[in-house]
Amino acid sequence: MADSIIQSPELGDVTGYLRERIRTVPDWPMPGVMFRDITPLLQNPKTLRVLIDVFVHRYMDAQLDLVAGIDARGFILGAIVAYELNLGFVPIRKKGKLPFQTVAEEYELEYGSATVEIHADACKSGDRVLLVDDLIATGGTMMAGLKLLERLGATVVEGAAIVDLPELGGSKLLQDGGLPLFTVCKFEGH
């Protein structure tokens, strides 16, 4: 799957510009994994602005009501995008981190399972929501977020992430599950 090329008069290939600034950490958190570290994008004010602008320009006319972000790096991207679009932000958290009544969704990991939660009053029926995370690997976390939002009556307009690892099957799982997906760049491998 080739990256879709996002062009800018000032930067040229924005996709390539951002992709080149994502650090690859071999064998972390375990041998054989090539960890795609987005923190260099966040640390530099220019790359952070370019990254946020990509999402803002994509969604500024999407008639959204909310942006939901997945714990933890999806909070960073999602909250900034929500602010720039003048929308509210909904955190989707790991189990036990939200103080009010919650709705939960369990999902499978490579070795076991995990649970994410959302406040029961986080959105209402008919809300149009953008669902954001930093990276799509197996797709389990974003699929769980999708199910939570839909259970509360929201329509998830699109899932969005900085990085897609298509060989792990997550983007296919999400698209096959009916979720349109936008990612800034793709990397081969794990």
Swiss-Prot record:
Its EC number is 2.4.2.7. It is an enzyme of class 2 (transferase). Keywords: Cytoplasm, Glycosyltransferase, Purine salvage, Transferase. Pathway: Purine metabolism; AMP biosynthesis via salvage pathway; AMP from adenine: step 1/1. One of its GO terms (molecular function) is adenine phosphoribosyltransferase activity. GO terms for biological process: adenine salvage; AMP salvage; purine ribonucleoside salvage. GO terms for cellular component: cytoplasm. Its main location: cytoplasm. It is found in: Cytoplasm. InterPro entries: Ade_phspho_trans, Adenine_PRTase, PRibTrfase_dom, PRTase-like. CDD domains: PRTases_typeI. It catalyses: AMP + diphosphate = 5-phospho-alpha-D-ribose 1-diphosphate + adenine. Homodimer. Catalyzes a salvage reaction resulting in the formation of AMP, that is energically less costly than de novo synthesis. Belongs to the purine/pyrimidine phosphoribosyltransferase family. HAMAP family: Aden_phosphoribosyltr (MF_00004). This is Adenine phosphoribosyltransferase. The gene is apt.
